[in-house]
Every structure is written in C-alpha cells, then in structure tokens.
Amino acid sequence: MESRDVILRPVITEASMAELDNKRYTFDVDTRATKSQIKDAVEDIFEVKVAKVNVMNVKGKKKRMGRYEGYTKKRRKAIVTLTAESKEIKLFEE
C-alpha cells in the first residue's frame, strides 16, 4: 500500500486541535492499514519522526432519510505522536 493511500485526511475537531500542543496529530486512515504502515506513511509524507501511533475503529452511525434507514461508513482513526525533537506538521498550523 502506498503512503498516500494509507492517510486519507486530517481530522479537524476541537479535541484534535487541543492535542497539537503535545505534538499529537489525528488522521483518518485506510481501514486495512496497520500501525507500522501508518507510522511509515506519516514519516514519508511529512518528513517527521513518529514516537507512537494509537488507532481506533469508529463504527458507522445509523441515519434515516424519511422511512429509509442506512449507516454512515465505518472509519479508522489514527492519533500520531511525534518525538520531542521532530518538527511540526505544517498542515495543521492554519
């Protein structure tokens, strides 16, 4: 799996923005990606050093449109912690 295929998008929430001070970044990743693949992808794309990766699977929520029910897509979220000497990821600074 290519590095650009592993990381789908950054997660921009109030909680994830509060963790930027601790050098913790949150990404939506491919559901088949492992921790080591996520670590390699972040180091390759952003040229930083990763200390650890925490991963969680988020199940889809039930949604209704009139009388029709369905589910949103399940997703996998990764919280990446950078080392102390690593530089910041510029994607989140705006």
Swiss-Prot record:
The keyword Ribonucleoprotein applies. One of its GO terms (molecular function) is structural constituent of ribosome. Transmembrane segments: none annotated. One of its GO terms (cellular component) is ribonucleoprotein complex. One of its GO terms (biological process) is translation. Keywords: Ribonucleoprotein, Ribosomal protein, RNA-binding, rRNA-binding. Pfam families: Ribosomal_L23. Part of the 50S ribosomal subunit. Contacts protein L29, and trigger factor when it is bound to the ribosome. NCBIfam families: PRK05738.2-4. One of the early assembly proteins it binds 23S rRNA. One of the proteins that surrounds the polypeptide exit tunnel on the outside of the ribosome. Forms the main docking site for trigger factor binding to the ribosome. Belongs to the universal ribosomal protein uL23 family. This is Large ribosomal subunit protein uL23. It comes from Ligilactobacillus salivarius (strain UCC118). The gene is rplW.
